[in-house]
Amino acid sequence: MCVGVTLLAVLGALSRAYSGDPNEPLLLLSIPALVYFVRGQLYARQRVNGVRITAHQFPEAHRMVVEAARAFGMPRVPEAYVVLGNGVINAFASGHGSRRYVALNSDLFEVGGRLSDPDALRFFIGHEVGHIAAGHTSFWRQFGISVANVIPGVGSTLGRAQEYTADNHAYAFHPEGVQGMRVLAAGKYLYPEVDFDDIVDRARTDTGFFVTLVNLLSSHPVNTFRFAALADRGRPGRVL
């Protein structure tokens, strides 16, 4: 779908150029350069500010990254970094050139360390490495998403589909860690007290126009839909 969006964008730009509007196609066709710059700058930021996960530094986490890459049949193990989270629970995967990497905010990384829940950390690492294995971090995929974001709802829908795919990779890699997703709902200290199944059940009861709208405009599936997809492996996640 990203390839289709990219091709339509390029064809649209060329069409506008032939119709006598030179400014808009030039702006659109400059997006690849912007995406390249942003990817390079983001990668450099992790390298100079983050803590590299290696066999000697955070060896348990490094082993998780290596095992996830092997489980997904990846030819190269991606780099991995811990970055200062300042209270934000987040992680992401990206790349620059031929290099691929994952970055985990320190607040999320602590779940597997100081809070002693390695299953949860293994699941999150599986999710991020899954993004790379699924091709979500390629230059043209991210370019396609950038173009799709111009159309309200389209880019975010592609993003949600990718998140479900990465969740599927994480579940295949380490299903025992699925309960760690509660961190996304209540944070790193309260999540052990959260009832996972209650959030799953609310996917059926908490519905309506505004719930659909919130999900439509979100780059990630809302928690109720996402938890429900992880609980019922026989159904695909709800994108819309």
Predicted regions and their residues:
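Hydrophobic or amphipathic, alpha-helical segments that drive membrane association/targeting
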Residues: 1-88, 152, 240
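Pan-zinc metallopeptidase signature
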Residues: 204-240
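Active-site His/Glu-centered metal-binding helix of metallohydrolases
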Residues: 112, 125-133, 165, 169
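Divalent metal-coordination and catalytic microenvironments
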Residues: 65, 104, 127, 166, ...
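Short pre-active-site segment immediately N-terminal to the catalytic Zn-binding motif
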Residues: 107-123
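Catalytic zinc-binding patch centered on the HExxH motif and its immediate surroundings
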Residues: 83-101
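Short helix/loop segments within enzyme catalytic domains
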Residues: 56-63, 67-77, 152-205, 232-235
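Catalytic Zn2+-binding segment of zinc metalloproteases
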Residues: 128-145, 175
